[in-house]
Amino acid sequence: MRARHQDLLLIDVRGDSMEPDFLHGDQILIDRRDINPFQPGPFCLWDGDGYVVKLVERIPQKRGWYRVFSANDRYSAYEVNAEEVRIMGRPVWFARRL
């Protein structure tokens, strides 16, 4: 991957909503150039309160809406208008303590 440092964001995972994909304490590198959920998958979102990493997919029947869900099925999915969140980018790398 070739990216300028200003195109990258490094965040720490807090919580268990994305287990088993990402664990509490993991560090995730976000490519801020990849902000279109045309291909569903994990994205970093800014929800107004902070960064969250969730699985995101467009809802074809509802233009401008996303379905947001966790890898951990103990958490409920929800729908959100694209104007209510900001997609910060897609995870491209992560680090985990051994």
Where are the language model's segments positioned?
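Acidic/glycine-rich C-terminal interaction modules and beta/coil loop segments
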Residues: 3-98
